[in-house]
Amino acid sequence: KLHIPTISTKKSVELIRAAKAEGLKVSCSVAVHNLFFTDEVLEGFGSNYKTNPPIRTKEDVEALLDGLNDGTIDMITSDHNPLDIEHKKLEFDKATDGIIGLETAFGALNTMLPLELLIEKLTLSKAVFNIKNQPIAVGQVANLTLFDPSQSYEFTEKDVLSKSKNTPFIGKELKGKVYRVLVG
């Protein structure tokens, strides 16, 4: 089986959809920021938008969302890539590619996809890699996320739990606040 990580173009969605229709064993993922932002944000050359694959056109984003909705795209990844300030506080062309995304994944996409589909694509789709989901039951390891899908908030630097702050989401209005992740 072939897994293609972090696709970002309409053409990628079309090719993977065709491959799956032919019965080929292929899976893929898309990064949160490639769903949330379009290339219009690049006009200001902010280095926190510099990532690989790059942020694409509105047409690409729409195709990626269609691919999630029809099952072509198997999972959403945070594509969490922490970088120190020395690698991001540079001119756009000299800055290192990378965005952190763990803290913003749910809130960024909560209004873009149906809640059940979003949860599936963020969590349950790990079965693509033969990683089993544990049932919520006595004696089982619990992996739980406590969240309020209706709470809107402005994402600030205080919300960044990572040591790195390389995120274009600072100052963005998000909806769907994660309060706690419990593992154990």
PLM regions: where:
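Histidine/acidic residue-rich metal-binding segments in metalloenzymes
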Residues: 1-76
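A short acidic, glycine-rich active-site loop
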Residues: 49-59, 96-100, 167-173
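Glycine/Thr-rich phosphate-binding loops of Rossmann-like dinucleotide-binding domains
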Residues: 12-13, 36, 84-86, 145, ...
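Short amphipathic alpha-helical segments
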Residues: 16-17, 88-89, 158-159
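His/Asp/Glu-enriched, well-ordered alpha-helical/loop segment
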Residues: 1, 48, 69, 75-76, ...
